[in-house]
């Protein structure tokens, strides 16, 4: 039996538009981002996907993307689970900074390492910074020491995988079709795990906003195939645009 999993990065956010490092900052979608959510729903509808359950983060750009896509699918009634483990990678002291200005200051190669390397985190956010997640009530029930002040993709994967094993994988094994709407780096982490991508290869992976990525899995959740829905060239161009965000102007 083929299991179906869709990974969907949220639509364009205001800080995507402003080319700023976002991380765990809870920013809203732009009008384009809301349109991308609807378009994603339309692509999934055209594919004939009937979901049984959906998962998202606790950040509204992902939540609102999921809501827009489900409305277009006429599947608003789906049970939705929200978890901090699906949040974007925490960008530490880079959060809020302009990516191009940061590249001009520190060099494009350094910014690429911070953005796309596997195990090198950006400079950490101080625990006394008001923006640190330990001061956010949505994380109040969590162990303060579990909340990051910065993350690499490696530590993001360590955060995401328990949710995969405890929540998502059992549903897929039970034959359910699952939609996960999250963020560029939490989805890169899942992509790396599912496709057994090397630490070096993951550096070049960029996930575009608002384009559903459909995985077909076997009974043991090994990947049989995966593809972006819609026009492959459009997905390629969108991924290239993501890659260019870390370049100096």
Swiss-Prot record:
<keyword id="KW-0324">Glycolysis</keyword>
<comment type="subunit">
    <text>Homodimer.</text>
</comment>
<comment type="function">
    <text>Catalyzes the interconversion of 2-phosphoglycerate and 3-phosphoglycerate.</text>
</comment>
<feature type="binding site">
    <location>
        <begin position="9"/>
        <end position="16"/>
    </location>
    <ligand>
        <name>substrate</name>
    </ligand>
</feature>
<feature type="site" description="Transition state stabilizer">
    <location>
        <position position="183"/>
    </location>
</feature>
<feature type="active site" description="Tele-phosphohistidine intermediate">
    <location>
        <position position="10"/>
    </location>
</feature>
<feature type="binding site">
    <location>
        <begin position="22"/>
        <end position="23"/>
    </location>
    <ligand>
        <name>substrate</name>
    </ligand>
</feature>
<feature type="binding site">
    <location>
        <position position="61"/>
    </location>
    <ligand>
        <name>substrate</name>
    </ligand>
</feature>
<feature type="binding site">
    <location>
        <begin position="115"/>
        <end position="116"/>
    </location>
    <ligand>
        <name>substrate</name>
    </ligand>
</feature>
<feature type="binding site">
    <location>
        <position position="99"/>
    </location>
    <ligand>
        <name>substrate</name>
    </ligand>
</feature>
<keyword id="KW-0413">Isomerase</keyword>
<dbReference type="InterPro" id="IPR005952">
    <property type="entry name" value="Phosphogly_mut1"/>
</dbReference>
<comment type="pathway">
    <text>Carbohydrate degradation; glycolysis; pyruvate from D-glyceraldehyde 3-phosphate: step 3/5.</text>
</comment>
<dbReference type="InterPro" id="IPR013078">
    <property type="entry name" value="His_Pase_superF_clade-1"/>
</dbReference>
<comment type="similarity">
    <text>Belongs to the phosphoglycerate mutase family. BPG-dependent PGAM subfamily.</text>
</comment>
<keyword id="KW-0312">Gluconeogenesis</keyword>
<feature type="active site" description="Proton donor/acceptor">
    <location>
        <position position="88"/>
    </location>
</feature>
<feature type="binding site">
    <location>
        <begin position="88"/>
        <end position="91"/>
    </location>
    <ligand>
        <name>substrate</name>
    </ligand>
</feature>
<dbReference type="InterPro" id="IPR001345">
    <property type="entry name" value="PG/BPGM_mutase_AS"/>
</dbReference>
<dbReference type="Pfam" id="PF00300">
    <property type="entry name" value="His_Phos_1"/>
</dbReference>
<dbReference type="GO" id="GO:0006096">
    <property type="term" value="P:glycolytic process"/>
</dbReference>
<protein>
    <recommendedName>
        <fullName>2,3-bisphosphoglycerate-dependent phosphoglycerate mutase</fullName>
        <ecNumber>5.4.2.11</ecNumber>
    </recommendedName>
</protein>
<dbReference type="GO" id="GO:0004619">
    <property type="term" value="F:phosphoglycerate mutase activity"/>
</dbReference>
<feature type="binding site">
    <location>
        <begin position="184"/>
        <end position="185"/>
    </location>
    <ligand>
        <name>substrate</name>
    </ligand>
</feature>
<dbReference type="GO" id="GO:0006094">
    <property type="term" value="P:gluconeogenesis"/>
</dbReference>
<dbReference type="InterPro" id="IPR029033">
    <property type="entry name" value="His_PPase_superfam"/>
</dbReference>
């Amino acid at each position: 039996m083929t299991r179906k999993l869709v990974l969907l990065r949220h639509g364009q956010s205001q800080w995507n538009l402003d080319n700023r490092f976002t991380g765990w900052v809870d920013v809203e979608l732009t009008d384009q981002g809301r349109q991308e959510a609807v378009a994603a729903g339309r692509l999934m509808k055209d594919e004939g996907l009937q979901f049984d359950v959906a998962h998202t983060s606790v950040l509204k750009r992902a939540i609102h993307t999921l809501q827009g896509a489900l409305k277009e699918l006429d599947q608003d009634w789906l049970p939705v689970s929200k978890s901090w483990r699906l949040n974007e990678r925490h960008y530490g002291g880079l959060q809020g900074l302009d990516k191009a200005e940061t590249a001009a200051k520190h060099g494009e190669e350094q910014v690429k390492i911070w953005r796309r390397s596997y195990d090198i985190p950006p400079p950490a956010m101080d625990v006394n910074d008001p923006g640190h997640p330990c001061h956010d009530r949505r994380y109040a029930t969590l162990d303060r020491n579990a909340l990051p002040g910065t993350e690499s993709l490696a530590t993001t994967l360590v955060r995401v995988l328990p949710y995969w094993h405890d929540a998502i994988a059992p549903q897929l094994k039970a034959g359910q079709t699952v939609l996960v709407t999250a963020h560029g780096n939490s989805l890169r982490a899942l992509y790396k795990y599912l496709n057994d991508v090397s630490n070096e290869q993951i550096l070049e992976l960029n996930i575009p906003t608002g384009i559903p990525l459909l995985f077909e899995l076997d009974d043991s959740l090994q990947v049989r195939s995966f593809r972006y829905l819609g026009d492959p060239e459009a997905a390629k161009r969108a991924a290239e645009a993501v890659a260019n965000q870390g370049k100096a102007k």
